[in-house]
Design a protein with these regions (language model features):
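Membrane-embedded transmembrane helical bundles of large multi-pass transporters/channels
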Residues: 1-213, 355-365, 369-557
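N-terminal start-of-chain detector that recognizes signal peptides
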Residues: 62, 164, 171, 215-221, ...
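Hydrophobic alpha-helical transmembrane segments in integral membrane proteins
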Residues: 202-230
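Structured non-transmembrane domains adjacent to transmembrane bundles in polytopic membrane proteins
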Residues: 221-418, 435-436
Length: 557
């Protein structure tokens, strides 16, 4: 969110810098600059919020919380970095408008402020909120209020700002980038054809992307957890596995219910995806109701006897012939409990290689089919499967489903907002089109890179819409502003020289931020950082290469 927030600051401050050559007061420069870029920033904030909040349809608590928190953070970034930061900058420059004075001192103060700000956030979250707040207040005092006070005391009246004529390497790079995007924008039909072919191929690849859970995608392969799982698979293989749970509730003392449970166990014995012991028998974690019935030496054909036996097991545990406690009552209650006039029981089975999501999905589907014959039994009131592998499988399915829901919702809502704001279908449409390209390119690259859809990467689709629409809005809004008073050639040139370069700066800052996350030791965070950095780069390409070509075509018409 810090990386995204910088985008607001880059655009507003860049527009303010464009007005610095005008011989007017600093306050008027800020008003003119924000008057030009303010509507674009507001639209960008709204579209960002829509994209993030679309994740609340996911049905997964962590993803919903992510969407809500990101929406709040987008609003905070808009206020603090989009409005407050350039306003403070204009005030500081109005006090100390000699740009060549104390360059070294201002550089030291900037570095100190940035370092203390970053450190205060880390300390606030990980060490102590009180110490973090003290660091923030110290930062404001030392690097904002004190410099302003000192600058105001030594203020000099300078009528005209000195213009720096020397071009550093950054200015030269900006000019080269500007020339490239203007050259491409002047060949709109060829540009659109090339990117349309790229999009068609990337869409083909994106549709082949699969949702899966791999432990290696979430945890460091050298961590004790992953090493332990590898050793478990190596030494025990198909004789154990992650535990899946079959739940059955009803009048289980009924002999027919006992026969049905025996039939279920017999059917499961033939399932190769379930763990079997060295003798080839189905592995059922002890104690279970079938083994308890065998150990108590009851036939299971007498309902009253069954009920009394079950109640004794729950209250007293399993006592052997020598009057020794074999299973305590507490242990029995992990397998068998009484709820009113009904009993509930669970059968725990092993699922080998459950880290492979295809295996887990197969197990879930097959077990659900095997339980279907209990549907019409009057003595069975409830049944189902649960356990960590199946919960995880459902979460992944929900994540994939949320991806298919959140992307259309975010795109449609953004289009409606743009349509109302621009009051033009063609400008709203061409602003949204590049976003679809970004999503297609992103998931196509994910397929090529061997990534998969999981609880983390599924959210990036909606984020890509938020970032992409943000970039597109700035280009379209600036172009509409310039086209009112210039020809489309001049409007395009001013848009790309001004807003296009600002997009380059904001994109680079975000790419750097997420690329750093790509070095995280946990693959979950590392892949998120890498994919998001790629997504921001694609959003930049789409906004400065594809969108200008579309704007040229619709403006000519």
């Amino acid at each position: 969110m810090v990386s995204f927030g910088v985008d607001f600051a880059v655009h507003s401050i860049r527009r303010y810098q464009e007005e610095k050559s005008n011989n007017i007061t600093f306050d008027k420069k800020f008003i003119i600059a924000f008057g030009g870029v303010g509507s674009a920033l507001t639209l960008a904030f709204i579209s960002d919020a829509i994209a993030f909040l679309s994740n609340i349809t996911a049905g997964i608590e962590s993803v919903v919380h992510f969407g809500l928190a990101a929406g709040v953070a987008a609003f905070a970034s808009y206020i603090v970095l989009g409005i407050y930061a350039p306003f403070i900058l204009s005030k500081i420059e109005s006090i100390d408008n000699n740009n060549n004075k104390n360059k070294f001192l201002w550089t030291i103060e900037a570095i100190g402020s940035a370092g203390l700000s970053g450190g205060s956030v880390i300390v606030f979250l990980l060490v102590s909120p009180l110490i973090g707040i003290i660091m923030i207040l110290t930062n404001l005092l030392m690097f904002l209020l004190l410099p302003i006070y000192l600058a105001s005391r030594s203020k000099k009246n300078i009528e005209k700002e000195e213009k720096i004529n020397n071009k550093n390497i950054f200015v030269k790079f900006e000019e080269m980038f500007s020339n490239i995007i203007i050259f491409i924008a002047k060949k709109p039909y060829l540009t659109i054809l090339v990117f349309a072919l790229i999009t068609a191929y990337s869409t083909f690849l994106a549709l082949k992307l699969e949702a899966r859970f791999e432990v290696a995608d979430f945890f460091n392969e050298e961590s004790e957890f992953v090493v332990g799982l590898d050793k478990l698979d190596y030494h025990f293989g198909d004789t154990t596995g992650e535990i899946g749970v079959i739940y059955i509730k009803g009048d289980l003392s009924n002999p027919l219910a006992i026969e049905d449970m025996k039939k279920l166990i017999e059917n499961l014995d033939s399932k190769e995806f379930l763990a079997h012991d060295k003798m080839g028998e189905l592995l059922l974690i002890e104690p279970n109701l079938m083994s308890l019935i065998n150990q108590t030496n009851i036939s299971g054909n007498n309902k009253k006897e069954n009920q009394e036996t079950f109640e004794n097991l729950i209250n007293q545990g399993l006592i052997n012939e020598n009057n020794e406690e074999f299973y305590s009552s507490n242990r029995i209650k992990f397998t068998l409990i009484k709820e009113g006039d009904e009993f509930s029981t669970v059968f725990r089975v092993g699922i080998p290689d459950s880290a492979n999501q295809k295996v887990t999905t197969l197990a879930r589907n097959e077990l659900e089919k095997e339980l279907e014959f209990l549907n019409n039994k009057t003595y069975i009131s409830d049944f189902g499967i649960t356990g960590s592998p199946f919960v995880r499988d459902i979460e992944l399915s929900s994540a994939t489903s949320s991806l298919y829901k959140s992307i259309p919702i975010a795109a449609f809502a953004s289009f409606i907002v743009l349509l109302i704001t621009f009051r033009s279908i063609k400008y709203a449409l061409v602003t949204v089109i590049p976003i679809g390209l970004v999503v297609s390119w992103l998931y196509g690259i994910m397929f090529i890179g061997g990534y998969s859809l999981n609880l983390v990467t599924a959210t990036i689709g909606a984020i890509s819409i938020g970032v992409g629409i943000d970039f597109s809005i700035h280009i379209t809004q600036r172009f509409r502003e310039e086209i009112r008073k210039n020809s489309y050639d001049i409007a395009l040139q001013k848009t790309l020289n001004g807003t296009g370069i600002a997009l380059l700066g904001s994109a680079l800052s975000s790419i750097v931020g997420f690329s750093i996350m790509g070095f995280a030791p946990m693959p979950m965070f590392s892949s998120f950082g890498q994919i998001t950095a790629i997504m921001i780069f694609l959003a930049l390409i789409s906004s400065v290469f594809v969108l200008p070509s579309l704007l040229v075509i619709v403006s000519k018409k």
